[in-house]
């Protein structure tokens, strides 16, 4: 999975897909009551990027629905995963539940269309800190109450704050979640980051019977040398401001027979097992 990073304006969706991304990550900004208002990062953000691009959240969902609905004139078959970077750290933890209800409802109304020809992409809920775990509970509660639990099959969870992996597992256990789990490791592209935690996450993913990590990705990678380093370790995905650089690295002899781009036929919730 090549995840385009900080794809917050509607016109950027096709721009990043044209560069080779098959997944996009966008920031979801909330008001003080936990209502998802905009796809917006704000200042500061990654080096060399404009931090202020944005869209109204519901309008953004309407657009990506079209891009991920077969038969729609805007359909792009390569876009298979949407990662929602939920800016919950900007609001009180007490509002995490309200935020979960709101995001689930807006996805039902504007993306899935409650079963009426909605978008087909997989959804990854990127949660910054384990203390905001009530968001997940609320999201699942809302799908159940609205009679649309079938969409759980399309939804995964990912804690992105580089917290202790065992702490993350404990929170997932508390929530009763042991599938559809991704693990991110990374830092803004402005700073270097070692591989210690990334290696631990990959080790857990590859431990037989370990349920709490099915995919691991590194973010936000801009240098080809760091992309190569991550691929050598065996990551499932790379988040980048420059998807075209990842595409180029994947074509190199060292990687071309080991990796390929994920398509809609690839299940993002299953551990990859080499044949």
From Swiss-Prot:
| Function, in words | Dermonecrotic toxins cleave the phosphodiester linkage between the phosphate and headgroup of certain phospholipids (sphingolipid and lysolipid substrates), forming an alcohol (often choline) and a cyclic phosphate. This toxin acts on sphingomyelin (SM). It may also act on ceramide phosphoethanolamine (CPE), lysophosphatidylcholine (LPC) and lysophosphatidylethanolamine (LPE), but not on lysophosphatidylserine (LPS), and lysophosphatidylglycerol (LPG). It acts by transphosphatidylation, releasing exclusively cyclic phosphate products as second products.
One GO cellular component assignment for this chain's record is: extracellular region
Q: Which cysteines are joined by disulfide bonds?
A: 45-51, 47-190
In which family does this protein belong, per the annotation?
Belongs to the arthropod phospholipase D family. Class II subfamily.
Q: State if Disulfide bond is listed as a keyword.
A: yes
The organism named in the record is Sicarius peruensis
The entry's protein name is: Dermonecrotic toxin SpeSicTox-betaIIA2ii
Where does the chain bind Mg(2+)?
A: 25, 27, 85
Enzyme active site: 5, 41
- First-level EC class: lyase
Question: Looking at the record's lineage, which domain of life comes first?
Answer: Eukaryota
Q: Which GO terms describe its biological process?
A: killing of cells of another organism; lipid catabolic process
- Its catalytic activity? an N-(acyl)-sphingosylphosphocholine = an N-(acyl)-sphingosyl-1,3-cyclic phosphate + choline; an N-(acyl)-sphingosylphosphoethanolamine = an N-(acyl)-sphingosyl-1,3-cyclic phosphate + ethanolamine; a 1-acyl-sn-glycero-3-phosphocholine = a 1-acyl-sn-glycero-2,3-cyclic phosphate + choline; a 1-acyl-sn-glycero-3-phosphoethanolamine = a 1-acyl-sn-glycero-2,3-cyclic phosphate + ethanolamine
Which prosthetic group or cofactor does it need?
Answer: Mg(2+)
The record's cofactor note says:
Binds 1 Mg(2+) ion per subunit.
Could you tell me the EC number(s) of this protein? 4.6.1.-
- UniProt tissue specificity: Expressed by the venom gland.
> What keywords appear on the UniProt entry?
Cytolysis, Dermonecrotic toxin, Disulfide bond, Hemolysis, Lipid degradation, Lipid metabolism, Lyase, Magnesium, Metal-binding, Secreted, Toxin
Q: Which GO molecular function annotations are given, in alphabetical order?
A: lyase activity; metal ion binding; phosphoric diester hydrolase activity; toxin activity
- Where found in the cell? Secreted
